[in-house]
């Protein structure tokens, strides 16, 4: 009997009920882990993605919001050929995609201290929100006779 681990498929999803499970399984996925990132729930309907992209300038990074996804791409421009004795700061190009749940939208993106922070918000339309329906009761003294009425 074969077993399949589908946890890598859920690695970059935001706004789903199993958010904490998804973050846990992200560490076990075998794909490229560059750049490292955090996904945190700021409040009930707000999330933040933080990507560690030290060495990149805001001009070298793009954030694109599509239907149910956020795509972050970075491409470091080679300025001049340098001879490195040791190169520990990564400058390789990257592309990272985060899948979003329904009604989760990108609110803003900011670059601060080598971290790209993407703010997300879940805005459920008013028509989709649950609403309370008032129950009207008939006055207790009135009895309606249904028989004997003309149809």
Swiss-Prot record:
One Pfam family matching this protein: HSP20
InterPro entries: A-crystallin/Hsp20_dom (IPR002068), ACD_IbpA/B (IPR037913), HSP20-like_chaperone (IPR008978)
sHSP domain mapped to chain residues: 28-138
Keywords, sorted A to Z: Stress response
Origin: domain of life: Bacteria
Keyword Acetylation appears in the UniProt entry: no
The keyword Ribosomal protein belongs to this UniProt entry's keyword annotation: no
GO cellular component: cytoplasm
Similarity-based family: Belongs to the small heat shock protein (HSP20) family.
Protein name per its UniProtKB record: Small heat shock protein HspH
Organism field: Bradyrhizobium diazoefficiens (strain JCM 10833 / BCRC 13528 / IAM 13628 / NBRC 14792 / USDA 110)
């Amino acid at each position: 009997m074969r077993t399949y681990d589908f946890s890598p498929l859920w690695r970059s999803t935001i706004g789903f009920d199993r958010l904490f499970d998804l973050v846990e399984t992200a560490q076990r996925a075998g794909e490229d882990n560059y750049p490292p990132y955090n996904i945190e729930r700021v409040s009930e309907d707000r999330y933040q993605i933080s990507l560690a992209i030290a060495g990149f300038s805001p001009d070298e990074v793009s954030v694109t919001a599509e239907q149910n996804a956020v795509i972050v791409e970075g491409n470091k421009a080679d300025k001049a050929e340098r001879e490195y004795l040791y190169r520990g700061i990564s400058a390789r190009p990257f592309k990272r995609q985060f899948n979003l749940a329904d009604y989760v939208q990108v609110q803003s993106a900011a670059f601060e201290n080598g971290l790209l922070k993407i703010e997300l918000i879940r805005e459920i339309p008013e028509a989709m929100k649950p609403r309370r329906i008032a129950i009207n009761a008939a006055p207790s003294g009135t009895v309606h006779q249904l028989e004997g009425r003309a149809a």
